[in-house]
């Protein structure tokens, strides 16, 4: 799916699960690497700070081109992936799977109904009473934090194994953290907090009905989740330390993520975290 160059590969010395190798796309404007590779790796590790299960990501190089490899979320040949559009269509026969853009039927409420008989992922440390939707609401909370705009209905899935159905770990997070911006614009936003705030407030998901802002979308999902899980995700977000965030971002080499980009991502995460916490407590 998608237009990115990618192939399934095996990595010797690791387990038998395949890895999806995805080349970082080049910017049409000047041929520079767009940054999806560092964004996907960074989001994978940020997700771990709040307990979101994700596909394992490793940096890679193919014939001199930057890339990442993403480990399959399927554990063996007895498991299959049923993507969100199929899950929603099974619950709602009139659901339009062909829409490439805003889908009025794609809402948190519809997803909650579609996941009613689905178990949460096995990769977890959350309380045992979490439902699959409670975890999925956590995915949207993470999206809002990292400015992830690509949670379309094929960008989440259910793992099928015999009669068992479980929500898959989150995957495909390259469209996040302002990866597409140039350093010149990042610096302007760092110099002008109001400019940066306008930028983050424009962040929206164009696939859900109504094309909601990312923070509003997260609030909507959290509002439909059980109270315990809702508090769990917000508490996890609230307890993240600046040192933990810096540790993740500092691990990206400066040859890949410039100092300006590093500071921009740190500031972006701090602002979105505050918007989520302050906005929800005041709603």
Regions found by a protein language model. Name each.
Residues 35, 58, 128, 148-150, ...:
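Short, surface-exposed helix-loop/turn micro-motifs enriched in polar/charged residues
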Residues 57-64, 152-161, 282-283:
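Short alpha-helical "patches" and their helix-cap loops
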Residues 41, 64-67, 134, 139, ...:
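Non-catalytic, well-ordered alpha-helical scaffold segments
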Residues 1-99:
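Conserved ATP-binding subdomain of kinase catalytic cores across diverse folds
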Residues 35, 161-283:
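C-terminal catalytic region of ATP-dependent kinase domains
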Residues 108-182:
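Conserved kinase catalytic-core segment
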Residues 73-140, 250-251, 255:
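ATP-dependent phospho-/nucleotidyl transfer catalytic cores
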